[in-house]
Each structure stands twice: as structure tokens, then as C-alpha cells.
């Protein structure tokens, strides 16, 4: 299970890559943040021919959350999290909702934020199949807060199966480069609201 529904403004439409004769595009979707927080910037990938939208359009889409790991010459990995979509319109609109299942492949410890809120991070290994039958392994970073974080810390361990429902969130962080320059990057995670 890997189902995402989103509503937002499409921005920064451009070329991503090509495989064979198929061109893939990329864009950002600006989604209204929950609870009055800043907007979330969700990365999108899609087959270029499937995009019928223009810069700044308000759109509603469904798709699935994927991860892509890129290895560099210095043996460092960069994992990119994005939503792949065919621009199908969801039958039931949720402005930002994701359903996922899989096995926990990395589990953090229960922590307390500087604001006194309990939280825990874990990585979910999620497998999906493309329409062509290709199996994709995705590794999705997840965060849980408050009482829910305590429950998951007590009940679950690495390799355990879990189903979750939540939102996709983004945050900007600074990356210090070898030449002492600073690069601003966007990281994505699933904030878990329900589980079973």
C-alpha cells in the first residue's frame, strides 16, 4: 500500500531525466501547511507527456511516495523523496494524505524536543509495483509525535510490519559543502497520525 492524495499549486516545472525514449519531468507542489504552519513543498516526478498543467495552476493529484538513492564519488549517498504521479485526479480529495505499509528497517529512540514534545523517527521499507510490473523498494522517513510516539516506541521494533496514515511534510536545512559554501536543501518526511 502506497497511496498519496495532494492539492496545491504546481511550480518550477522542468526536465528531470529520460529513460529510453521516455522523458520525465519534475516540479514542486506548494501545499498549504497544516495547523497554520508554513507551506509544504512536495517534490513531484512524472512522465512528461502526462502533464497538462501550467506554472501556478491549482491541481489535485494522486500518486505514490518514492525514494531514490544516488551514490557519489566520495561514497556518500543522497536519498531523494518525491511523489510520482500520472496526474490522475483522486476520487476522494484529501489536501495532503498518505497511506503506507511496510516493515520498519530503522528505528530511532524516543526523544523530547526543546519544546517538551515527545517524538520518534523510523524508516519504513515499502514495496510497490509499477504498471509494467517492476518492483520498487522505497525507504520512507517517518516521524511520530506525542502519545502516538510513545505507543510506537513500546510496541514496534526493527523488521515489524506496520500500516500508517499521515501527511507529507517538508523542511529546509543547510548543507555545508567542502568549499565552505552553504547549500539550502529540502527534506521530506511522513508525519504519522494513525497506525495499525
Regions of interest found by a model, annotated:
Residues 1-196:
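Single-stranded nucleic acid-binding surfaces, predominantly the OB-fold ssDNA-binding core
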Amino acid at each position: 500500500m502506497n497511496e498519496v492524495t495532494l492539492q496545491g499549486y504546481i511550480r518550477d516545472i522542468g526536465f528531470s531525466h529520460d529513460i529510453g525514449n521516455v522523458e520525465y519531468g519534475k516540479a514542486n507542489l506548494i501545499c498549504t501547511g497544516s495547523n497554520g504552519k508554513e507551506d509544504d513543498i512536495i517534490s513531484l516526478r512524472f512522465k512528461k507527456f502526462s502533464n497538462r498543467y501550467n506554472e501556478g495552476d491549482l491541481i489535485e493529484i494522486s500518486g505514490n511516495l518514492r525514494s531514490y538513492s544516488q551514490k557519489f564519488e566520495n561514497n556518500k549517498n543522497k536519498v531523494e523523496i518525491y511523489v510520482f504521479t500520472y496526474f490522475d485526479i483522486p476520487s476522494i480529495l484529501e489536501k495532503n494524505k498518505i497511506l503506507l505499509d511496510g516493515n520498519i528497517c530503522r528505528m530511532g529512540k524516543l526523544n523530547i524536543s526543546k519544546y517538551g514534545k515527545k517524538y520518534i523517527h523510523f524508516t519504513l521499507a515499502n514495496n510497490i509495483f509499477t504498471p509494467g510490473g517492476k518492483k520498487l523498494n522505497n525507504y520512507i522517513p517517518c516521524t511520530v509525535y506525542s502519545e502516538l510516539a510513545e505507543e510506537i516506541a513500546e510496541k514496534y521494533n526493527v523488521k515489524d510490519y506496520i500500516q500508517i496514515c499521515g501527511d507529507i511534510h517538508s523542511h529546509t536545512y543547510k548543507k555545508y559543502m567542502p568549499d565552505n559554501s552553504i547549500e539550502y536543501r529540502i527534506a521530506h518526511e511522513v508525519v504519522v497520525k494513525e497506525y495499525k
